């Protein structure tokens, strides 16, 4: 009887060690993935990170994005995003920004409502925009993903944490060629560091980016090249620099893009951009040591541009 008890304890200890190894490896993959956001936010949908870009155009923009680690590793991260924005009145933009992220056993949902004001400058194509988002952020353990004791007290304690209010602030300068923008996301984490005890790794604290559209005259095909540079401050991680370019073929409604991230990863993508809709596919590949453990991540995006005729009649 005593030998059976010792044997069971030994098995239990080995299982705990194995589980810890799996969790730590999963956290490494999830952490790395969270450092590489949706690639569409750099060119096609800046509202994803900057509330100042809500309602910039007189059309209802509806964007759906899905991102998943190209790996069969249990708990590999996957993220879904929905944004909707439009301009209900002159100089005013509103939007809705929803993100659902699953990393390992943790599932986080963020729902934000946005108000933006667009101030016209001397040139009709120039605007200075300000935006603020307010909403809720909720993180919880996904019981369906647990292969073990679901009655563990630590799991129960984590899920007892309530959803909390959060906010973002952004500013942007835009013209027909130049974009310069910056945002302070996750304001609660930035200004109330001790107000929440839940685990929050790799939270974005600040981001700024700039891009400039260069028309390639003489091609006769409406080719436009837009170089981009961005800078990100991430909690618990070294600052990240992003550099890339977007090449648009307007006459064909196609674009190609590539972005390098200083955290040893690169994103490549292409898309179809038509009058009423757009589609994109992006692939993020790791260039550092973690490339041996993951096949990178893929991202799918679809955009609908609604009620354009209604706006044009006004």
Model-derived features: positions:
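Bacterial N-terminal signal peptides that target proteins for export
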Residues: 2-19
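Cleavable N-terminal signal peptides
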Residues: 20-21, 31
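Subset of outer-membrane beta-barrel
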Residues: 34-314
């Amino acid at each position: 009887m005593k030998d059976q008890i010792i044997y069971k304890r030994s098995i239990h200890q080995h299982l705990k060690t194995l589980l810890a190894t799996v969790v730590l490896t999963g956290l490494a993959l999830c952490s790395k993935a969270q450092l590489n956001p949706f690639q569409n936010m750099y060119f096609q949908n800046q509202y994803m990170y900057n509330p100042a870009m809500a309602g910039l155009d007189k059309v209802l923009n509806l964007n759906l994005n899905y991102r998943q680690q190209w790996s069969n590793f249990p708990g590999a991260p996957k993220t879904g995003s929905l944004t909707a924005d439009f301009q209900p009145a002159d100089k005013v933009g509103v939007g809705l920004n929803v993100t659902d992220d699953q990393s390992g056993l943790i599932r986080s949902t963020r729902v934000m409502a946005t108000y933006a004001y667009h101030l016209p400058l001397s040139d009709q194509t120039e605007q200075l925009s300000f935006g603020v988002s307010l909403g809720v952020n909720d993180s919880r353990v996904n019981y369906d993903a647990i292969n073990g004791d679901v009655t563990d007290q630590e799991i129960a304690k984590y899920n007892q944490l309530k959803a909390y209010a959060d906010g973002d602030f952004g500013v942007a300068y835009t013209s027909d060629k130049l974009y310069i923008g910056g945002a302070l996301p996750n304001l609660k984490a930035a200004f109330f560091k001790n107000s929440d005890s839940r685990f929050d790794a790799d939270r974005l604290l600040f981001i700024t980016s700039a891009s400039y559209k260069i028309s390639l005259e003489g091609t006769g095909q409406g080719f436009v090249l837009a170089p981009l540079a961005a800078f990100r401050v991430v909690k618990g991680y070294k600052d990240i620099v992003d550099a890339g370019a977007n090449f648009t073929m307007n006459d064909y409604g196609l674009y190609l893009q590539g972005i390098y991230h200083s955290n040893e990863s690169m994103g490549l993508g292409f898309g179809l951009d038509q009058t009423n809709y757009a589609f994109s596919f992006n692939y993020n590949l790791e260039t550092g040591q973690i490339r041996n453990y993951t096949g990178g991540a893929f991202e799918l995006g679809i955009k609908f541009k609604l009620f354009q005729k209604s706006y044009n009649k006004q």
